[in-house]
């Protein structure tokens, strides 16, 4: 069910009166969670608020003096101009050169309408270059339609594809006009009913080199890949006669959408752990009115493993990840009214600015960061998702550690 804005008024009531009102709303069928919330591991309160993208830490770096600094400005500039290389391994000129080149296709797409205030793919949905066909291609069933879209997604290069109904709780309250960082309407068309969520695997060897500018090339490459893939798949759906809006980090929170689409389970490091690639993915999405059969969320046991594992939090240099159980709350850059593991976004981003590159140590050290194509790793996964998860955590001590960037360059 879509988020009902009437719930926000409950936050201002006394606890006893709020309980009475909620009880009446439940009897009237007004206050209802999405039926799949339990299966997805999503728990919300009446204090739930849709997230304003203006409060995203990357947006705040342009208008909020508690985040904006000379270091943050240098961080963003380093992706678009010649940076001052360091002597340290992983931060040489060739490391930054590879990282910046990996972002090229994404940057070209993002810059197309920046002069109009639309930083597409990050702070605005991607504009459509393909008109919707007048005649619709009809499929016998929504299941057939979903299978067709997934086939096309694999052809274009997506590593994972799932479908979920459009849950408006995860849409941003507004987008950002990058000309002055003011709030702007999302601009989604009416009638959208489903979200096609795509997963894009990051290079495992480069991820092993984090923290480094070289490791940042793994992120940039997938943003460039996903920009092409999500635009191509959206064009295909529009050619079939249905609305399709391509989206990357913009427009809505893709993590809960990926969970609802059955692609994986939410983890302590705030990532989606997938059965094929662990946390080593980027996600994109397409909003559409195409009648599709939605996938069901799955909870194989990742959260239970995270309950006993704190490797990501322990490894974080600035201690931005939580050690305790999931809880409500969080800072300005966190969605409110959702019980989950939440990072300190300000601490995390401050470390990025010190590196002049992104950091994914929490991804690298995650025990699920493995190549599950091999049978020993698949066996470990079964153990990790079983009541013997503690034994799997003990075995993780023998997993490969960090790869020195110089080693990556020296390999054939």
Regions found by a protein language model. Name each.
Residues 2-8:
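Extreme N-terminal basic, low-complexity initiation segments
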Residues 109, 113, 352, 387, ...:
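Generic secondary-structure transition motif, activating predominantly at the C-termini of alpha-helices
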Residues 150, 156-373, 378-386:
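Catalytic cores of enzyme domains
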Residues 378-379, 384-395, 401:
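Charged, compositionally biased interaction regions
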Residues 394-412:
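Long, compositionally biased charged/polar accessory segments in the mid-to-C-terminal portions
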């Amino acid at each position: 069910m879509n988020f009902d804005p009437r719930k926000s008024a409950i936050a201002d009531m006394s606890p006893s009166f709020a309980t009475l009102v909620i009880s009446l709303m439940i009897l009237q069928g007004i206050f209802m969670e999405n039926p799949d919330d339990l299966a997805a591991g999503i728990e919300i309160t009446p204090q739930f608020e849709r997230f304003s993208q203006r409060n995203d830490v990357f947006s705040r770096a342009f208008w909020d003096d508690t985040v904006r600094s000379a270091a943050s400005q240098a961080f963003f500039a380093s992706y678009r101009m010649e940076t001052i290389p360091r002597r340290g391994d992983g931060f040489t000129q060739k490391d930054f050169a590879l990282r910046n080149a990996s972002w090229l296709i994404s940057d070209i797409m993002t810059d197309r309408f920046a002069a109009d205030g639309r930083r597409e793919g990050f702070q605005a949905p991607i504009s459509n270059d393909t008109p919707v066909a007048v005649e619709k291609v009809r499929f016998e069933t929504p299941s057939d339609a979903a299978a067709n879209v997934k086939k096309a997604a694999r052809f274009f290069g997506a590593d994972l594809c799932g479908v979920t109904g459009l849950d408006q709780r995860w849409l941003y309250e507004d987008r950002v006009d990058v000309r002055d960082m003011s709030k702007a309407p999302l601009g989604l068309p009416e009638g959208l009913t489903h979200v096609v969520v795509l997963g894009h695997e990051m290079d495992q060897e480069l991820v092993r080199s984090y923290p480094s500018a070289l490791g940042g090339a793994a992120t940039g490459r997938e943003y460039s890949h996903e920009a092409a893939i999500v635009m191509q798949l959206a064009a295909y759906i529009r050619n079939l006669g249905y609305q399709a809006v391509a989206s990357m980090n913009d427009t809505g929170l893709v993590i809960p959408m990926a969970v609802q689409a059955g692609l994986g389970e939410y983890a302590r490091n705030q990532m989606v752990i997938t059965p094929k690639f662990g946390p080593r993915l980027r996600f994109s999405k397409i909003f559409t009115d195409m009648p599709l059969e939605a996938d069901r969320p799955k909870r194989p046991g990742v959260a239970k493993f995270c309950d006993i594992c704190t490797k990501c939090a322990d490894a974080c240099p600035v201690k931005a990840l939580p050690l305790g159980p999931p809880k409500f709350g969080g800072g300005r850059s966190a969605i409110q009214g959702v019980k989950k593991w939440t990072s300190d976004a300000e601490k995390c981003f401050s470390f990025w600015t010190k590196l002049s590159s992104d950091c994914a140590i929490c991804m690298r050290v995650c025990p699920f960061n493995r190549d599950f194509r091999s049978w020993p790793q698949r066996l470990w996964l079964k153990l990790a998702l079983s009541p013997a998860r503690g034994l799997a955590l003990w075995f993780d001590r023998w997993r490969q550690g960090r790869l020195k960037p110089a080693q990556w360059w020296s390999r054939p």
